[in-house]
Amino acid sequence: AYQDYGLPYCFSASLFNTGISEPNDYNKDTIEKITNNGEMTESTSDNGVRPNVLFVQLESFFDPTEYEDLQMSEDPIPNLRKMFENYSSGYFKVPSVGAGTANTEFEVLTGMNLRYFGPGEYPYKTKLKNQVCESAATAFSAFGYGTHALHNNGGNFYSRAKVFNNIGFDSFTSKEFMNILQTTENGWSKDDILLTHIKDALDSTEQEDFVFTVSVQGHGNYPTEKVIENPKITVTGAPTEEKNNAWEYYVNQVYEMDQFAGNLVKMMEERGEPTVVVFYGDHLPTMGLEAKDMKSRYLYNTNYVIWDNIGLQKEDRNIPSYQIMADVMDSLGLHSGTVFNYHQQRRQTKDYLKDLELLQYDILYGDQYVYNGKPPITEGHMQMGIKEVTLTDLVENLDETYSLYGTNFTKWSKVYINDEKQESTFLNNTRIELPNSKLK
């Protein structure tokens, strides 16, 4: 919407205009025609191979060489570059610039197009935190997949804990369930921590898994002073020294994000399980870029690549974020989820976008004619964290303090006695100290 109407209009309109307005021709007959009398709600498969499917949303990621004025001492994305060359890849059209992570996420997970919502709206905040909705999680669960979401930042940001529950995930592991030891100079968790938790998600079930990972390392703001003492990659070409410092910081975060991507692929290769991994950037970084700065001359493009170990044909094309889930599922012979089925069947047909708006309205704001009284999800069932947090022992120390022993504690763990929060000190993942609590 911002690219259509501009910032001033969208900002003011976002205060009053949310949701999808009812289309003029919205009625039961129209929806039944669009969905072939509800056939699009069915789940079918025409392929015996059901791999693990991992989506990795890389915070503020794009290929820095797309910024034409920037010179770097070496390629900041050698692992992803190799993937670009050998696997399906291209530009990834996203709904926002410099911010709006949750909106790209929304399009990827639901297949819905943000264009039909209010300008500047976040459906996570306005709709999905209070209403269940089918998504990639429910689509994959229809085939028996375990479904997991991961994020190395706070679980309540963008109401993710509520949203992921409402769209059908089995589990959500946020930073509150991670022992994060490494952070950027700006204080964001480094992405390498996600490897352990992706492995835990895959190990938590006997069947195939859909794992949706949201990274945070590349997050702004980007420091305008030099904060990395000995950067792996040096940068020149930005218009000012301050901008150059910001770009150098960003490029070095991207380099480490690329190392994370390479390590994830290596981990999946070593597991030996059939697997597809999709990497993509959620939006461009907040660097004040203009269209003329970019090779693509477009500010809503990031990059994506689809790595696999099952022999998928390389097929390069540019794709909007709301279509990628349907594309990946189609390549695997999986047809599930009303909106994803719609994309697979109708993308090249007349009135594709017009009918998509009608379908989105019916599912989120209308009478849900598409489900004929049988929606694919009626309530959430999600648990926070993959591994159970347990308390196994309470020990009184000689100084009349107490030590709690258990498993999977983190620095975010809180201790309550009779519903009263206690002062506590996290020592490690098996021990927490209570310096001032009275238990007698």
Segments the model singles out, each with a brief description of its role:
Residues 4-9, 23-28, 77, 102-105, ...:
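Alpha-helix initiation and N-capping motif
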Residues 38-50, 58, 63-433, 440:
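Solvent-exposed soluble domains appended to multi-pass membrane proteins
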Residues 1-3, 439:
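Transmembrane and membrane-interface helices of multi-pass
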Residues 6-48:
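Helix-hairpin-helix/helix-loop-helix acidic hairpins
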